[in-house]
């Protein structure tokens, strides 16, 4: 029998692979339309916020579901899909370039819409 911590680590790693690969593919696909604004990162982070809200609502409502499955989906896939470090790097690049309006819009949309989408996802499932 595999210890739970090893099993969960494997589940998270597999989910991270899926989420990271999906993030890369979306970023590549959106690069052509970016024109200097990090649309790919914004889209994956906002989609990830909605998805983690939906999953949080689902797993809190259905506590009988496996914690390994919840870790695979939330920490693994959503964690691999979304990226705070790239968001921060892109924000710093805008700051260094003096693109203050783009920086303000990027940070405000990311944070405000991100929180709103997590809440929307959570409450949609909890209804």
Residue ranges, per PLM feature:
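Membrane-interface helix-loop junctions in multi-pass transporters/channels
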Residues: 1-127
């Amino acid at each position: 029998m595999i210890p739970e911590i090893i099993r969960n680590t494997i589940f998270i790693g597999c989910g991270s692979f899926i989420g990271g690969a999906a993030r890369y593919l979306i970023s590549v696909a959106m690069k052509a339309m970016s024109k200097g604004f990090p649309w790919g990162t914004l889209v994956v982070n906002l989609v990830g916020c909605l998805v983690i809200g939906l999953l949080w609502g689902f797993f809190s409502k259905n506590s009988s579901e496996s914690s390994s499955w919840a870790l695979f989906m939330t920490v693994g896939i959503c964690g691999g899909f979304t990226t705070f470090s790239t968001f921060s790097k892109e924000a710093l690049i805008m700051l260094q370039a003096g693109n203050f309006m783009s920086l303000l819009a990027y940070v405000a949309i990311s944070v405000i819409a991100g929180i709103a989408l997590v809440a929307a996802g959570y409450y949609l499932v909890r209804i």
